[in-house]
Amino acid sequence: MHRLTRDDIEQAASLVYQVMPATAQYAWPLLAERLACSVWVKHENHTPTGAFKVRGGITFMHWLKRMHPEVKGIVSATRGNHGQSVALAARALGLRALIVVPQGNSPEKNNAMRGFGGEVVEHGRDFDEAREEAARLAQLHGLYLVPPFHTELVKGVATYALELFSAAPDLDTVYVPIGCGSGICGVIAARDALGLKTE
């Protein structure tokens, strides 16, 4: 992955803001009092899917349509938020979205993916088996296989960190939940692009 610039992230933000507004970040005084430091919370639960990953889905699908205009649809494996993200973004661009989840996946997540236009296929005991099936279906149906981690996903995710650092540039530390790593990579990319020293 190449180092993202501020311009890269701002261009990604312009795509994201066609679908959703920036999300809020608030200082939480009671939590700050308890921890004896200033605390800011970035409210990515206020996105259309309720998670930051929607930003990466938007930028990835725009990249895909630019780089592979012949693509008619995508397939990806997920347990939820990534699937909602790519389903929403694919539908907005007129692409089919086939989402493979492990058997026994959360019915709420599956229904949310369907609600955003995804065709949900349950396969396998875990994410790895679902991912293998997604690769097979990509070949079978001529769909583009969307990976769980990609530079374009990170570029979109970095937009939430750009918003946070623009609102609160003097943060000492940012805590980020980690799954496949797009969230933490997006925060690091935005921090570095802005020349900040935040840990």
Placement of each model-derived feature along the sequence:
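PLP-dependent amino-acid enzyme catalytic core
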Residues: 1-199
